[in-house]
Each structure stands twice: as C-alpha cells, then as structure tokens.
Amino acid sequence: EANEVGVIDFQDAVLGPITYDPVSLLKDCYIRWPRAQQLEWLDGYLMRLSNLGAPEVSIKDTAPVAEQASRLQSLAIQLENVTAAQFQRWFDLTGLQRHLRVLGVFARLHLRDHKSSYLADLPLVTKYVREALALTADSHSSVAEFRDWFESELMAVIRKQSWYEAIDSQGWAL
C-alpha cells in the first residue's frame, strides 16, 4: 500500500556485484514489481551511479570519508562506458544467482529449521529464476543448458509440490 512503511534488512550485507542491491530491492522475494518499472528504476540507479563524480572532501573530513569519496569517483569512472543494456544483463545474471540461492535457503528453512512459512514465497522466486534464465540463456551455453534442465526436469518436480502455484506471466519477460 502507498502509506505502508518498508524495512530494508541489511544483516547479511556483504561486498558483491554492483547490481546485487538493485536486484534485492527490485526483485524482492515477497513483492513483484512490473518488469518495465524495474528497468526504469534500474536505469535511474545506473544514471545516479554514473553521475557520482568527485565529491568535495574538505580538510576536516576523516581519512575514511576521503577514501569513500575516492571509491565513488573510481566507480563513476568505471561505469562511464557501461551501457544500460549491459547493466541490465548484469542485473539479470545477478538476479539469477540470487534467486537460485534463495530457493535453496527457503528449502533449508523448511526442511531443517521447520519454518514452512517461506514455502508460500517459492512460486514468486521460482518465477524470477525462470525469467532470468529466459533473459540470459544467450549469455553462455552453460546458462542455456541449465535453463533447459531447469525447465524440463526441475519444473516437472516443482509443479507437483503442494506450495506450487502458477503465476500469471503477463508482464514477465518469459
């Protein structure tokens, strides 16, 4: 809802791919944003990263602040030649990795820790994996082979699970 407060959980924060944060926010395991909206926000994110430039650092600033400013400037320089299409590809590949990991985590929480409430979120996460595989299968033959296996073998098993429900594909890049 428009007036609800959201919480960003950063307890597992680690250094990772530049597109991990946008994947986590825009392809959340509990809510789905339309692909067009995701890409609009992703383009804005890339634009802001690319425009970081050189922040002004005063003599009063501590060494960590100056170091962070230097990192931001370096990041902006590294992103100068990254196209929106390339950044989107990184986003989709990072999303594939993240959501495959989440499928495993949610299964573990159910099987080992007896926390079955996460099973309700598996259909959305499965759909994210399928979408990412459809979008990135041309990136490498191993991704295409994995997609074929996932669709033919794993989806046959997934469809038989009590938690599985088909999600409407309208608005998905499938």
Language-model region placement:
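Active-site activation/catalytic loop segments of kinase-like enzymes and analogous catalytic loops
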Residues: 18-59, 67, 71, 93-113, ...
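Amphipathic alpha-helical interaction segments
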Residues: 40, 76, 86-90, 124, ...
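ATP/Mg2+ or Mg2+-diphosphate-binding catalytic cores
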Residues: 104-174
